[in-house]
């Protein structure tokens, strides 16, 4: 069976669950979304007829999902991203396709739950991943989860997955000092990034750098900024402050206004825009500030 997944911390959790549950994974394909269709084509060229998909949003790639369903014997999707209401209507009739989508937690939590894995170490690790991936900023382990994510990006995901499975899902003995050093180093970089790469427009903060982005999001949210938008290589990462009283309908309306579609995480969604940077930032600044004013939102 092929495993097709993302390349982030939640994808690592999915790999741990999938590789623990199944011993017949022939190959794992990762995508960072920039090569999404290319990786789908690689999977289509692979002789393995069974595909497990985890932590991938097909909102912009429905044609790719259709190709997989039409050309493989079995396709199973575990995901946590939001989709338009009728997105799966035609696909759910396909006998070789099944999906398990739960937007209340991360994809690795869904895998862990559905696979009924009984291991306390993995359970705790999945909890940490869920806290980070769904941005539970009021959880007591939120900053520990942030540190785990920083450390994760210094590792090879396949090698790390293999190591954790072999070591009963325990992090290396040097994890804490090495991860804390990464945190401390990033904090030293923040002041310079704030001076050169951070611009505020009303309740919106724009960050023109991917370095220390999450740290800046946390800080700006503490300052009661409603939105923080990271922009790098035509990718726009929108992070919504959960301390503001946005309802589910508000968040759906917001994503529709920003992206023209309702998919992705309601508080943390990403889209690509290859048009003029200045014009897009101007559009977002006006749109989001007007959105807050029109609805008379207030931060808690």
Predicted regions and their residues:
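Anionic-ligand anchoring segments at beta-strand to alpha-helix junctions in alpha/beta enzyme folds, i.e.
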Residues: 1-44
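Divalent metal-coordination and catalytic microenvironments
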Residues: 8, 18, 55, 79, ...
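Short gly/pro/ser/thr-enriched loop/turn and capping motifs at secondary-structure boundaries
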Residues: 11, 82-86, 108
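A short acidic, amphipathic alpha-helical/loop segment
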Residues: 39-43, 62-68, 216-220
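Gly/His-enriched, cation/cofactor- and phosphate-binding structural elements
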Residues: 49-50, 180-300
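Active-site cofactor/cluster-binding pocket
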Residues: 56-89
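Hydrophobic, aromatic-enriched interface-forming segments
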Residues: 126-197
């Amino acid at each position: 069976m092929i495993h097709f997944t993302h390349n982030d911390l939640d994808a690592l959790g999915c790999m741990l669950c999938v590789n623990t549950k199944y011993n017949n994974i022939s190959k794992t394909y990762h995508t960072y979304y920039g090569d999404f269709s290319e990786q789908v084509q690689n999977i289509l060229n692979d002789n393995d007829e069974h595909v497990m998909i985890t932590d991938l949003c097909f909102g912009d790639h429905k044609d790719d999902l259709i190709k997989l369903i039409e050309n493989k014997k079995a396709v199973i999707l575990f995901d946590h991203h939001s989709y338009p209401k009728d997105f799966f209507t035609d696909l759910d009739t396909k006998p070789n396709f099944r999906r398990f989508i739960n937007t209340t937690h991360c994809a690795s939590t869904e895998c862990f739950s559905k696979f009924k894995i009984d291991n306390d170490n993995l359970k705790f690790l999945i909890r940490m991943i869920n806290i980070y991936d769904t941005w539970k900023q009021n959880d007591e382990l939120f900053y520990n989860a942030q540190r785990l994510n920083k450390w994760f990006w210094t590792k090879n995901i396949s090698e790390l997955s293999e190591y954790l499975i072999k070591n009963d899902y325990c992090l290396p003995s040097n994890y804490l000092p090495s991860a804390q050093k990464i945190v401390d180093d990033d904090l030293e970089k923040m002041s310079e990034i704030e001076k050169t790469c951070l611009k505020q427009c009303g309740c919106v903060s724009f960050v023109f750098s991917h370095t220390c982005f999450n740290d800046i999001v946390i800080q700006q949210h503490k300052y009661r900024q409603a939105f923080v938008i990271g922009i790098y290589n035509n990718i726009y990462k929108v992070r919504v402050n959960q301390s503001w009283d946005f309802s589910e309908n508000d968040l759906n309306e917001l994503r529709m206004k920003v992206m023209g579609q309702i998919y992705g995480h309601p508080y943390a969604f990403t889209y690509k825009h290859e048009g003029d940077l200045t014009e897009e930032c101007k559009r977002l600044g006006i749109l989001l500030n007007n959105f807050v004013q029109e609805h008379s939102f207030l931060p808690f």
